[in-house]
Each structure stands twice: as structure tokens, then as C-alpha cells.
């Protein structure tokens, strides 16, 4: 007669089944005891959600995900844990409420190889070194006092910029490259007190680095696979670019050191002089040493910031050309404020109330970095009711915040008037308008960049009328984007200038 098999803790069958029972129960235990992560798409083995990032515009890909899963979304990108937030409320939690927790940066091959092992304020890990750089920027390089002292240089270079455009009146020109030349000329004035040799070499190097810094690359998502960047050839590309940048910056520094050595009396101090003084240990009580590589990293990240300013100027002109009423209103204001003058002067910029609204609206719709530079959690933290584990990479999709219909009426329309009588600025306290970031890692060059934007747009509106080439209509201007280290126009804006109020340099 058959007997029923009995399972007991001594039964061999129990021990055979035990591993299978553990495999069945483990996910339930993990789900119960593990952290409450934000929702997100299903993860594939090894690659996780990398396939969701396909396409040239990551801010749009991530916007689709948060539209589906909510304003906070968890991703697995290769070996990395990542979270994307796309609401003003959650951006404030990440950048302001938990500013110190999310003050760190993830490391990339670009930041490690080209930017001197994560040197400079943009890529530095959070700590004493970062705090020192922030202090240097705030008090020595880009303080309001430093910006005010630079306005004479800005005005002089602006007049030269206008005269060059006057010489090309009546034919189509691409504004972007001319704006970059102006911005680099102003930077070199502030950096060394005058022009440098072959400034176009620095512009090209900055553009090349920007093109190789498109968000994060596949190699960054698998940091343990050290052969990957070698096999892809990306390390070779970066090494060549690093040498090019190194040679340029070494030339700039050595030339400045020669001038300092040959000076027979007191010299006017410029940005590079301040950095070299800190490198040499003069005038600094900090315990954190400033090396020659730190100096080069700071100088080059200042150059990179010029590309963002130039892109914003082009977006602003594009939007105004698409909106003739906005263009005329801004132009009428500029010509009223500067009436009778033959050049733009910074002392009158505070009177350009409508132009300031135009710039805010341009930065809302076209932020320099649609995905704010990623942060890295320094410890476990709760955001929006979910756990963000230590080491997680966090992106704030400001492009999504700037186009959020719950925050902005008719969010895809260029409407500067939406900021009228609204006390909202770029200092990071208004999470609806944070194109320059917020919290501990807010961009230190806001005043410098915005002043240049106001001067550039004022000059273009004051001295010239503008037409589209080949009879193109305003609504035909394409607004396609290209993503590098920031977001620029895919196709450069071509316009025809007509001189109305001549300028003499």
C-alpha cells in the first residue's frame, strides 16, 4: 500500500527544494525590505534602460518617461542607478532642501581625462576643494564688482562686434560665430587685459569638447568595463583633445607669466593673475592647494560657458524673429532707452524692462543645459516619498519644468509678458525658473552671462533691422535642437542685417 511522502526538516527532498524555495521567496523579501524606489520602466539584464535613451535629445526621451511614470522616475543605466525629476516641486527638494546631499557629481571619462581629473568647479567632487573654488568665483572672478569692472571692456568689444556686422549689411550672416568671437574677446580682456594670439583656436577647442560631452556616453554607464573606452576609441579622441587644450592653456599661462616677470611696476590684476597668485600660494590662507591644472580647468570652463551664452543669444533672436510683435516691442524699448547714442552702454541696461522679460522667456524655453548637470547622492535620501540610495545619479530635467503646462499657460508659446509683475529671478529660489541650476552648485557666472546677453541683444536691436533670407516667413524658421554639452540650434540662424543707427568703434 502506497504511503504519502512526508516532508520534514530531515527529509532529503526538503534540502533539494530549499534553493528553489529561496529563489521564489527572495524577490518577495527584497520587495518587502528593500528601499521604496521611484517607479520606472522595466529593466533589461545588463543594459537596464539604456535603450530608452536612444535618440539625439535625451531631455525629450526622459520627458516621455516621466510623462508615463510620474514626475520622479527610476532608471537603471548599465551599471548605474539613476533618477530623473521633472517637476518644480521635486527639483526644489533635490537642489535646495537636500542641497548638500545632492551636491556631488558623477565622474565621466570627459571630466576625468580632459578636465584634469574632475578639476574646476563644474566637475569637482563636493568638498573643501569645491568650496574653495566657489569662494574664488564669488569673490575674485565673477563677483558683481568684477562684472561691473568688466563693462568698459564689454562695451568696447561690443562696438567692434557691431562695426563688423555693419560691414556685412545686406547679405545673410550667421550670428552665432560672430557672437562667440565677441564673447571670447571679452573673456580674454577680463582674463589677461587684452587680446590673445589666435583666439579662434580656443573657440574651436571649446566647441570640440562640447561636441564630445553629449550628456553621458555608453562608456560612462559601465565604469567597471575599463576596456570599453579603449575599444571604442573614445579615450584616444579625448587624449588628443586634452593635449590640444593643454598646449593652448600652457601658452596662455606662460605668456602671462613672462609679462608679469618683465613688469617694471604694479600691474592691473586680471582673472588669470588672480588664479596664478593663488597657485603660487600668495594671498591665500586655505589648506587646499591650487595647482597649475586647477588653473587650466577654471580658465577652460570659463571658455566653455561662453558657448552657452552664445547659444542663448541665438535662441532669443530666433524666437523674436518668429514673433514680430515681440521683436518690435523689444526694439522700440531699446531704441527709446539709447536714443541719440552711437553705442550701447551698460549703465542703461537696468532700464530695459521688456528685454529682461525676453531673456527670461528664452531661458525658460531654451535653457543652456536642458538636463541640469547630474548630481550624485552622497547618502540615502527621501525625495517625493521615495528612497534615493547613496551613489544614485540624479538628473533634473529643467526643459520639462520649463514646458510644464501646470506651471506655464500656453507653455510652448514664446510670451515674455508672462513674467510681467512676477518677482522671479535666476538666483535658484524660484524652482520654476532655474536655467542656471540652484543650491550649492548654482552657476557662479549668472551676472556675467546675463550682462553679456543684454548687451548683445541691445546692440542687435538698436543698430540694425533684420530680415530672413530668401523671402522666408517668420513661421518658417525651424527650431530643431542639437544636443552637446548643452542644447543649440541644429541649423544656425541666418539673418540679413540692415544698418539703421551706425556705430563707430
From Swiss-Prot:
Heme binds at residue 443. SUPFAM superfamilies: Cytochrome P450. It is found in: Membrane. Pathway: Alkaloid biosynthesis. InterPro entries: Cyt_P450, Cyt_P450_CS, Cyt_P450_E_grp-I, Cyt_P450_sf. Keywords: Heme, Iron, Membrane, Metal-binding, Monooxygenase, Oxidoreductase, Transmembrane, Transmembrane helix. One of its GO terms (molecular function) is monooxygenase activity. Its main location: membrane. Its EC number is 1.14.19.80. It is an enzyme of class 1 (oxidoreductase). Pfam families: p450. It is a single-pass membrane protein. The chain crosses the membrane at residues 9-29. Mainly expressed in roots. Its cofactor is heme. It catalyses: (19E)-geissoschizine + reduced [NADPH--hemoprotein reductase] + O2 = akuammicine + formate + oxidized [NADPH--hemoprotein reductase] + H2O + H(+); (19E)-geissoschizine + reduced [NADPH--hemoprotein reductase] + O2 = 3,17-didehydrostemmadenine + oxidized [NADPH--hemoprotein reductase] + 2 H2O; 3,17-didehydrostemmadenine = 17-dehydropreakuammicine. GO terms for cellular component: membrane. Monooxygenase involved in the biosynthesis of curare monoterpene indole alkaloids (MIAs), natural products such as strychnine, a neurotoxic compound used as a pesticide to control rodents, and its pharmacologically active derivatives, including brucine, used to regulate blood pressure. Curare alkaloids act as animal glycine receptor antagonists. Catalyzes the conversion of geissoschizine to dehydropreakuammicine by cyclization, which is spontaneously converted into akuammicine by aromatization. This is Geissoschizine oxidase. It comes from Strychnos nux-vomica (Poison nut). The lineage of its organism: Eukaryota, Viridiplantae, Streptophyta, Embryophyta, Tracheophyta.
Amino acid at each position: 500500500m502506497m504511503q504519502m511522502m512526508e516532508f520534514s526538516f530531515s527529509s532529503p527532498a526538503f534540502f533539494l527544494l530549499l534553493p528553489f524555495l529561496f529563489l521564489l521567496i527572495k524577490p518577495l523579501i527584497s520587495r518587502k525590505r528593500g528601499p521604496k524606489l521611484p517607479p520606472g520602466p522595466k529593466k533589461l539584464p545588463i543594459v537596464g534602460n539604456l535603450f530608452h535613451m536612444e535618440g539625439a535629445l535625451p531631455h525629450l526621451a526622459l520627458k516621455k518617461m516621466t510623462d508615463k511614470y510620474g514626475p520622479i522616475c527610476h532608471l537603471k543605466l548599465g551599471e548605474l542607478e539613476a533618477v530623473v525629476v521633472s517637476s518644480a516641486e521635486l527639483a526644489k527638494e533635490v537642489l535646495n532642501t537636500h542641497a548638500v546631499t545632492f551636491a556631488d557629481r558623477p565622474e565621466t571619462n570627459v571630466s576625468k581625462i580632459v578636465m584634469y581629473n574632475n578639476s574646476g568647479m563644474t566637475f569637482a567632487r563636493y568638498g573643501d576643494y569645491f568650496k574653495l573654488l566657489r569662494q574664488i568665483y564669488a569673490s575674485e572672478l565673477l563677483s558683481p564688482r568684477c562684472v561691473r569692472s568688466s563693462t568698459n571692456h564689454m562695451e568696447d568689444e561690443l562696438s567692434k562686434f557691431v562695426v563688423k556686422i555693419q560691414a556685412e549689411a545686406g547679405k545673410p550672416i550667421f550670428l552665432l560665430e560672430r557672437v562667440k568671437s565677441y564673447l571670447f574677446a571679452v573673456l580674454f580682456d577680463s582674463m589677461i587685459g587684452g587680446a590673445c594670439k589666435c583666439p579662434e583656436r580656443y573657440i574651436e577647442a571649446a566647441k570640440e569638447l562640447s561636441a564630445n560631452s553629449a550628456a553621458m556616453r555608453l562608456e560612462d554607464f559601465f565604469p567597471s568595463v575599463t576596456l570599453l573606452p579603449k575599444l571604442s576609441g573614445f579615450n584616444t579622441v579625448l587624449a588628443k583633445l586634452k593635449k590640444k587644450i593643454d598646449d593652448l592653456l600652457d601658452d596662455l599661462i606662460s605668456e602671462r607669466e613672462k609679462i608679469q616677470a618683465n613688469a617694471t611696476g604694479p600691474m592691473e590684476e586680471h582673472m588669470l593673475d588672480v588664479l596664478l597668485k593663488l597657485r603660487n600660494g600668495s594671498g591665500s590662507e586655505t589648506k587646499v592647494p591650487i595647482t597649475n591644472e586647477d588653473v587650466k580647468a577654471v580658465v577652460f570652463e570659463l571658455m566653455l560657458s561662453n558657448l552657452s551664452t552664445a547659444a542663448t543669444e541665438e535662441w532669443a533672436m530666433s524666437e523674436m524673429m518668429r514673433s514680430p510683435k515681440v521683436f518690435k516691442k523689444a526694439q522700440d524699448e531699446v531704441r527709446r532707452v539709447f536714443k541719440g547714442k552711437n553705442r550701447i552702454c551698460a549703465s542703461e541696461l537696468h532700464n530695459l524692462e521688456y528685454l529682461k522679460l525676453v531673456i527670461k522667456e528664452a531661458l525658460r524655453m531654451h535653457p543652456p543645459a536642458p538636463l541640469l548637470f547630474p548630481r550624485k547622492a552622497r547618502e540615502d535620501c527621501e525625495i517625493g516619498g521615495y528612497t534615493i540610495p547613496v551613489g544614485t545619479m540624479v538628473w533634473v530635467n529643467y526643459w520639462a519644468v520649463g514646458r510644464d503646462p501646470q506651471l506655464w499657460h500656453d507653455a510652448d508659446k514664446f510670451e515674455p509678458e508672462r513674467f510681467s509683475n512676477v518677482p522671479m529671478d535666476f538666483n535658484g529660489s524660484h524652482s520654476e525658473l532655474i536655467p542656471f541650476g540652484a543650491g550649492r552648485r548654482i552657476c557662479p557666472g549668472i551676472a556675467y552671462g546675463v550682462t553679456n546677453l543684454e548687451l548683445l541683444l541691445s546692440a542687435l536691436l538698436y543698430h540694425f533691422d533684420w530680415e530672413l533670407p530668401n523671402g522666408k516667413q517668420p513661421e518658417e524658421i525651424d527650431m530643431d535642437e542639437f544636443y552637446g554639452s548643452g542644447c543649440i540650434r541644429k541649423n544656425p540662424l541666418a539673418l540679413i542685417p540692415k544698418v539703421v543707427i551706425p556705430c563707430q568703434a
